[in-house]
Amino acid sequence: MRHFNKIAVAAAAIFVATASPVHAADKLTADDTARFLAGMPPSAGSPLTALTSDPSWQRHARFFDAAFGQLEQRQLSRIRAWTGVNLAAPKPTMFYMFSGPDFLYADAFFPNATSYVLSALEPPGSVPDLTRLPRGGVGAALYNVERSMSSILSFSFFITKSMKLDLGDGQLNGTLPILYIFLARSGKTIRDVNPIALDDKGAAHFANENPGRNLTRGVRIVFAGSDGREKTLYYFSTDLSNSSARVSGFLKFCETLAPGDSLIKSASYLLHSPNFSAVREFLLAHSATMIQDDSGIPLAFYDQRRWRFFPFGRYAGPIAEFPGRYQPNYTELFKRAQPMDFGIGYRWRAHESNLLLSINAR
């Protein structure tokens, strides 16, 4: 118990710099920190305003303005248009397994969700009080963030090894800095940030509460869009293979928010493996709508009597890094595919990408 309390206090301290004011007079907020990291001006009177005169931040802001502007034009605006036409009745919850910190595409595909549940192996990490970084520390931190995000800004997915190197042991580490950036660049306002832990029954615990053994750690971010409606983003660091998924409380927690809609992309074809059958079965049982590329759940696992399939794009098979994952029934299904004007997944070029919209007709 004493050992856990020390861990819990340390976990809570990680978020102090961003979830609540650092100095009562300064009013440093998570939202201002997110905007600063995203290359966007913080609110008037923020202690971070002084740092925006730093040439490294100004270069960073120009870089992100250009990168996100291109991404918006090339993909995100087109995904939102596709969603508006093809998703008739979205659920309040969306599940995004193997996501990394990719809130950007979760929001683009499911802008009307009110609860977003993201999960991956990477830890949440921390965001320190940026005003207290040593001289030159801000520029180095911003550069590492840019490097860690280069693949998703260019290709729509994270390269996990690169992200670990760039956001491993530095001032900014884990997924939280990137979640902040994506929230800010998606036009969201962060209202609250807290560490969260799940016990093995799926119950959520905060602050110094003891979740017991087999805990699953994460972060809960409460935010609002331009309409002011409050929403919640959960990110959990968890192993989704059977040996872990069956003893942790993560899927039990997800079940309390089900049914939901699900997104699967660039998932290393893990859901093709028998070692990930637990999460695969959860998604099939608790998803009203599934959007996936071919790295998601193989067609053979869908009950053809319960699901209706709407293929988009072109199925060109897996990339060379994933041999043996070709699906002949995908080839047959995609003979009737509708066109789409954006790229997604490992085959990120628009004329090579595939997307399968599956609707549970139960």
At which residue positions do the language-model features occur?
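Bacterial N-terminal signal peptides that target proteins for export
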Residues: 1-9
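Short, surface-exposed basic-aromatic patches at helix termini and helix-loop junctions that form
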Residues: 88, 176-188, 209-212, 225
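Short, thiol/selenol-centered motifs that function as redox-active sites or metal-ligating centers
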Residues: 99-110, 155-180
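Thiol-based oxidoreductase modules, predominantly thioredoxin-like and allied folds used
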Residues: 117-164, 191-210
